[in-house]
Amino acid sequence: MLIPIPALNDNYIWVYKRENLSVIVIDIPEIAALSQFIQAQNLVIGALLITHNHRDHIGALAEFKQFYPHVHIYGPAECADQGVTQVIDAGRLIIDEYHIDVLPTGGHTAQHLSFLVDGHLFCGDTLFSAGCGRVFTGDYSQMFTSLQLLKSLPDETIVCPAHEYTLGNLAFALTTGKNKSAVQKQLEKVKKLRAENNPSLPTTLALEKQINPFLQVEGLEEFIELRKAKDMF
């Protein structure tokens, strides 16, 4: 089971569950929608994974701890003072038979993490469909390296970003002139999905390699130029 629960204006709380196991939750911008879903489905949360320390990803962390006081919360050191119970930076977590690869994907924030679970990539604000996160650190090299790391994963990887930014990202991607036919085709598909209030996510790494200009750059200089252009778009 893979469910994107809408939160705030354009966030998703991702919920992942393998049969007969507990639920893994990624990021917690608000509590109500998640708790209602967990209760309605009679589920047990095995862990909360935090990608980074922005308020739209940890805003309900304190409430989460009140609702689920025994659930371990894993996240980067930048979230240590926000209520994360287990600070991590890389490596592998084993939680209730889940093997979770922790990937350092800094750039949006310095210690941003992504999580790979059973071929599902929960990448927070590093990689979006047809886009990538803003480089608030100013460290474009770090962000470029993070995106190259994610790009190196298998094509069949299911990509689960934290925001519904796809329409705007595709509009920008069209202006870059990169693989315009694939971008236009995906734009029409996403317009229909969003018109019916359906999420455009998840996506796949194979598709992102076709439509995401930030995965098509040939080097750091081109990435910096493209990211700054998107900032002004």
Swiss-Prot record:
<keyword id="KW-0862">Zinc</keyword>
<comment type="function">
    <text>Thiolesterase that catalyzes the hydrolysis of S-D-lactoyl-glutathione to form glutathione and D-lactic acid.</text>
</comment>
<protein>
    <recommendedName>
        <fullName>Hydroxyacylglutathione hydrolase</fullName>
        <ecNumber>3.1.2.6</ecNumber>
    </recommendedName>
</protein>
<dbReference type="GO" id="GO:0019243">
    <property type="term" value="P:methylglyoxal catabolic process to D-lactate via S-lactoyl-glutathione"/>
</dbReference>
<comment type="similarity">
    <text>Belongs to the metallo-beta-lactamase superfamily. Glyoxalase II family.</text>
</comment>
<feature type="binding site">
    <location>
        <position position="125"/>
    </location>
    <ligand>
        <name>Zn(2+) 1</name>
    </ligand>
</feature>
<keyword id="KW-0378">Hydrolase</keyword>
<dbReference type="InterPro" id="IPR001279">
    <property type="entry name" value="Metallo-B-lactamas"/>
</dbReference>
<comment type="subunit">
    <text>Monomer.</text>
</comment>
<dbReference type="InterPro" id="IPR035680">
    <property type="entry name" value="Clx_II_MBL"/>
</dbReference>
<feature type="binding site">
    <location>
        <position position="108"/>
    </location>
    <ligand>
        <name>Zn(2+) 1</name>
    </ligand>
</feature>
<dbReference type="GO" id="GO:0004416">
    <property type="term" value="F:hydroxyacylglutathione hydrolase activity"/>
</dbReference>
<feature type="binding site">
    <location>
        <position position="125"/>
    </location>
    <ligand>
        <name>Zn(2+) 2</name>
    </ligand>
</feature>
<feature type="binding site">
    <location>
        <position position="54"/>
    </location>
    <ligand>
        <name>Zn(2+) 1</name>
    </ligand>
</feature>
<dbReference type="InterPro" id="IPR036866">
    <property type="entry name" value="RibonucZ/Hydroxyglut_hydro"/>
</dbReference>
<comment type="pathway">
    <text>Secondary metabolite metabolism; methylglyoxal degradation; (R)-lactate from methylglyoxal: step 2/2.</text>
</comment>
<dbReference type="Pfam" id="PF16123">
    <property type="entry name" value="HAGH_C"/>
</dbReference>
<keyword id="KW-0479">Metal-binding</keyword>
<feature type="binding site">
    <location>
        <position position="56"/>
    </location>
    <ligand>
        <name>Zn(2+) 2</name>
    </ligand>
</feature>
<feature type="binding site">
    <location>
        <position position="57"/>
    </location>
    <ligand>
        <name>Zn(2+) 2</name>
    </ligand>
</feature>
<dbReference type="InterPro" id="IPR032282">
    <property type="entry name" value="HAGH_C"/>
</dbReference>
<dbReference type="GO" id="GO:0046872">
    <property type="term" value="F:metal ion binding"/>
</dbReference>
<dbReference type="Pfam" id="PF00753">
    <property type="entry name" value="Lactamase_B"/>
</dbReference>
<dbReference type="InterPro" id="IPR017782">
    <property type="entry name" value="Hydroxyacylglutathione_Hdrlase"/>
</dbReference>
<feature type="binding site">
    <location>
        <position position="52"/>
    </location>
    <ligand>
        <name>Zn(2+) 1</name>
    </ligand>
</feature>
<feature type="binding site">
    <location>
        <position position="163"/>
    </location>
    <ligand>
        <name>Zn(2+) 2</name>
    </ligand>
</feature>
<dbReference type="InterPro" id="IPR050110">
    <property type="entry name" value="Glyoxalase_II_hydrolase"/>
</dbReference>
